[in-house]
Amino acid sequence: VEPLWTKKPADLKDEDYKSFYRHLFPMADEPLFWIHLNVDYPFNLTGILYFPKIKNNLDIQRNRIQLYCNQVFVTDAVEGIVPEFLTLLHGVIDSPDIPLNVSRSYLQSDANVKKISGYITKKVSDKLASIFKNDREEFEKKWDDIKIFIHYGMLSQDDYYDKAKQYFLLKDTDGKHYTLDEYAEKVKE
């Protein structure tokens, strides 16, 4: 059976992604959404990353992303490959371009690993921006579940902060959501 992450996103339906998630994480709630990674230049990377529904702080688990090399499982300790603020995501990444038997400090200095980490951050940011732009109401409904990723990313990575500030939300006491720019305008009034 061909692994789902090796297929083209256009050939897959939402149910395929959900079924694969249930296979990987049978006890987890349905994911909020997912990102299908598929790039072959300047490095090879395929995979599917899922945003899990996090019910409470006790539910936060790391090491839920499985690393494969040419469809052979390597590890679920992906620190250094996946940006730290995204290690709470669930899923699979597969790349022959990640050195396998090296120290964490070597990984952090490897050029391909840095590119892969940056690519994953960009894809996550693009997906969040797309949901925000195309269906803000749906984005606001998911905000309480995804804000931990966005907060942590904005605090830990300057380049992510610059991207995320466009869809970062604040909630007032009435439960209405505002972007930073909208909130600044409201305060001026």
Describe the function of each predicted region.
Residues 1-189:
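Conserved GHKL (Bergerat-fold) ATPase module
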